[in-house]
Amino acid sequence: MTQEYQLETILAHAGINSDEATGALASPIHFSTTYQHPEFGHSTGFDYTWTKNPTRATAEKTLAAIESADYALATSSGMSAIVLAFSIFPVGSKVLAVRDLYGGSFRWFNQQEQEGRFSFTYANTEEELIHHLDHDPVDVLYIETPTNPLMLEFDIAHLAKLAHAKGAKVVVDN
């Protein structure tokens, strides 16, 4: 039987391991560097800090532990996270999204629609989202909460339950 820990316990112990190079018990912060390898073509697992570094690896392990997930991915920006999330959806996916979005997301969505990758339906309120989930085919529900710029909030758990019941995936940006 696996013991379940409270969030505070997970966070207090995340990243606590002995650093081989320094003996530090808490993971040091690695800002920017390149890494030495034993020989050409044999990586230590870290090449350049912009692809992977020990600090981000610790953060990803911590996020996975908090969510009881096998793994988590950290990206360099919110837009890169959105692009990464949408990369798993097939061409032609029908996306239901909140209308009040960060401008960069809205522009990227428009570009994707113009290129024929996805089709988007937008809703202004939670009631409209529920209506579309009940009546329209939806492959992906995309919500931003609180929204930008109007700071609207949505019941993520309720919307996710409805979307999952219809077989839709849910992407949440906050």
Give the label of every model feature segment.
Residues 2-53, 60-62:
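N-terminal "arm"/small-domain region of PLP-dependent enzymes with the aminotransferase-like
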Residues 23, 63, 81, 95, ...:
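Buried hydrophobic positions in well-ordered alpha/beta secondary-structure cores of metabolic enzymes
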Residues 34-80, 87-88, 104-111:
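Conserved N-terminal alpha-helix of the aminotransferase class I/II PLP-enzyme fold
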Residues 42, 141, 156:
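Ligand-binding pocket scaffold of soluble enzyme catalytic domains
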Residues 74, 98-99, 148, 152, ...:
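Glycine- and other small-residue-rich loops at beta-strand/loop junctions that grip anionic moieties
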Residues 89-145, 161:
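PLP-dependent aminotransferase-like
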Residues 120, 170-171:
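Hydrophobic beta-strand scaffold residues
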